[in-house]
């Protein structure tokens, strides 16, 4: 059977709880590699492993769904595997499992700096396995570096995402203090979002503070509420790395109906909050594409010797009150 083989390590609820926003008109340049030797010819069966960051539920369910759709459309076998707990050693172990299974191609949901993957990428290349990243390209990059350890990168430009968030706040007339929080300090993408937003706000003369949080919504609410008491001039707060629940609770408990909340990625909670006005907008990376495009790019490389000439940017885009209805309509279908 073609499609996605889910490799479970624990019981998980497979109901999709989030989605992505309307696809933007991004383009990709494809170049033919002259004389390239690949692990499969156009007539061979192709086996691709997608090494995820987590179980195929919630946010990561959309990456898995994208990989599944690509497998069905291309007629290839896609195996989705993931570590029980997301650490660099655990994810490397899963990559090694895919290599041991003689995968033709591997796409990894890279969450750490390139240095963490350099050794396993070199070993995959030596074994003749195509190795790509289902994550953001280097900040500001467009054209692929020929010396890149990854065959391709398919993800959102997180530096641009932070700047977009700041731009939207400035367009809303924000002039007071803004707090930007990262709930997962070890995640380089979330930190880049936060840093880029803060830098852009400060460049425009707006006071912007960084706040480190945990992934626990209750602790997030307590931390933000305490910050708001210390800084009553705060006019906006951004959640860069988790669902918006803790921020919504802090807004309600503090009686700050005027507090502008913004976030990243899409959850049912954020869509509802955007619809009723409690949240202004969310920055979306369109993670369905982060699952679909790596499978397509690996398949086309393995069968036809094609490699992307530029990095494929899945975002950033914005979901706000003007388009939230369209996004919600596709959430239950697993595409948004």
Segments (PLM) and residue ranges:
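Short beta-strand elements in bilobed, periplasmic/extracellular small-molecule ligand-binding domains
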Residues: 73-85, 179-180, 200-218
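Hydrophobic alpha-helical
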Residues: 110-126, 197, 209, 213-273
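Short, well-structured alpha-helical segments in soluble
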Residues: 89-104, 220-233
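Short, solvent-exposed amphipathic alpha-helices that sit
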Residues: 59-74, 161-165, 188-207, 223, ...
């Amino acid at each position: 059977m073609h499609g996605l083989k889910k490799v479970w390590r624990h019981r998980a609820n497979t109901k999709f709880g989030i989605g992505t926003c309307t696809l933007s008109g991004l383009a990709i340049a494809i170049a033919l590699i002259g004389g390239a030797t690949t692990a499969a010819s156009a007539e061979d069966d192709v086996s691709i492993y997608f090494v995820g960051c987590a179980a195929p539920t919630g946010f990561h369910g959309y990456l898995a769904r994208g990989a599944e759709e690509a497998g069905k459309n291309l007629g290839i076998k896609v195996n989705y595997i993931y570590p029980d707990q997301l650490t660099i050693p655990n994810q490397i172990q899963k990559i090694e499992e895919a290599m041991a299974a003689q995968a033709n191609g591997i796409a990894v949901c890279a969450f750490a700096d390139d240095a963490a993957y350099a050794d396993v990428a070199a070993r995959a290349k030596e074994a003749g396995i195509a190795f790509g990243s289902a994550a953001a390209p280097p900040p500001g990059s467009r054209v692929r570096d020929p010396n890149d350890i990854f065959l391709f990168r398919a993800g959102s430009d997180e530096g641009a995402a932070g700047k977009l968030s700041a731009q939207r706040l400035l367009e809303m007339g924000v002039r007071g203090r803004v707090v930007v929080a990262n709930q997962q300090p070890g995640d380089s993408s979330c930190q880049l979002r936060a840093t880029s937003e803060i830098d852009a706000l400060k460049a425009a003369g707006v006071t912007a503070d960084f706040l480190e949080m945990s992934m626990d919504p209750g602790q997030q609410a307590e931390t933000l509420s305490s910050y708001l008491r210390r800084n009553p001039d705060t006019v906006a707060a951004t959640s860069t790395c988790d669902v918006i629940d803790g921020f919504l609770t802090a807004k309600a408990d503090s009686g700050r109906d005027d507090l502008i909340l913004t976030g990243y990625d899409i959850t049912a909670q954020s869509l509802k909050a955007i619809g009723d006005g409690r949240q202004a907008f969310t920055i979306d990376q369109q993670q369905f594409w982060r699952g679909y495009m790596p499978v397509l790019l690996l398949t086309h490389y393995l069968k036809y010797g094609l490699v992307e000439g530029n990095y494929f940017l899945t975002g950033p885009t914005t979901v706000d009150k003007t388009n939230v209805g369209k996004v919600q309509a596709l959430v239950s279908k697993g595409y948004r």
